[in-house]
Amino acid sequence: MSSSSATSGVVGDRGVPCKCVCGLSVTVFTSKSQDNSGRPFFRCISKRDAKTWTNNRNGHLFKWVEEAVFEEVEDALPRLAVIANEINKAKSEALELKAMIQEILEEALINKMQIRRNWCGLKLGFVWLFVITIVIVYVLFGQDNEKKLVAGY
């Protein structure tokens, strides 16, 4: 096996290949050459027989596994950076929402205390109204039987 790492016939294919340009699937083989003994590589299944392998790949896929994995990692790093950025944005939004919730809870507590104060004031107002009504009724109708309300005098 040659130590070349070109992906013959697959222009722009990065990462772990799943199909050859001929349309057949790709499988992993292990190199038995002296230069790359035991080194795994991807190869088109049409080239199963090692005797048909030549330096001229006849347009079929050949790629070393570690190069494919390296390309996958290289391609994943920007996506990981984007995901990390999104996580940081989500964390800051969560902190903002927690602060907003805290403000709303504080406002609710203040409003609850104001409602209690107003309710007590309303009760006190009704008590005074009741007392004044009783006093007026007593003054008008509760004094001596001799004094009666006479119209005009």
Curated annotation (Swiss-Prot):
GO MF terms held by the record: zinc ion binding
Principal location listed in the UniProt entry: plastid
Stated name of the protein: Uncharacterized protein At1g43920, Chloroplastic
Segments crossing the lipid bilayer: 121-141
Species this chain originates from: Arabidopsis thaliana
This protein's GO CC annotations: chloroplast membrane
Transit peptide: 1-43
Location relative to the cell: Plastid, Chloroplast membrane
Record keyword Zinc-finger present: yes
Annotated positions binding Zn(2+): 20, 22, 44, 60
Origin: domain of life: Eukaryota
Topology term for the membrane: Single-pass membrane protein
InterPro entries to which the protein is assigned, alphabetical: Znf_GRF
